[in-house]
Amino acid sequence: MSERLRAVVDALDVRPGDRVLEIGCGHGVAATLVCERLDGGRLTAVDRSPKMIAAAARRNATHVEAGRAEFLVAELEELDLGERRFDKVFAVRVGLFHRDPDRARSLVNRWLAPGGKLFEFFDPPG
């Protein structure tokens, strides 16, 4: 596993019951690390690439089958998560607010549960 992604997930301080949203999940490596810390919580991971989502879902098949994870193909600005709320929303090396910053900010703010936090990582934490 990537030490950089381990450091990212450590910085998230994932709790067993957390509801976590990853934006731009790529191959699902960080998703695996998050799911290993969940017990009753759930990860929703999105990426605009169907190939990346397929790879991430394969990598995390046991977590998907256990109901700890779901993987969705979607652009951030088009993502419809209904009334779901998240304790932690994170992205690694993804520019969340460059295409339609106002819409992206509005969506992320709506998805955050009271007391929830947004994490953006471009370099290893530390």
Annotated model-derived regions:
Residues 77-89:
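A short acidic, Gly/Pro-enriched loop at the edge of an enzyme's catalytic core
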Residues 21-79:
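Class I SAM-dependent methyltransferase SAM/SAH-binding core
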Residues 88-101:
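A short SAM/SAH-binding and catalytic strip from SAM-dependent methyltransferases
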Residues 1-9:
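Conserved SAM-binding loop and adjacent beta-strand
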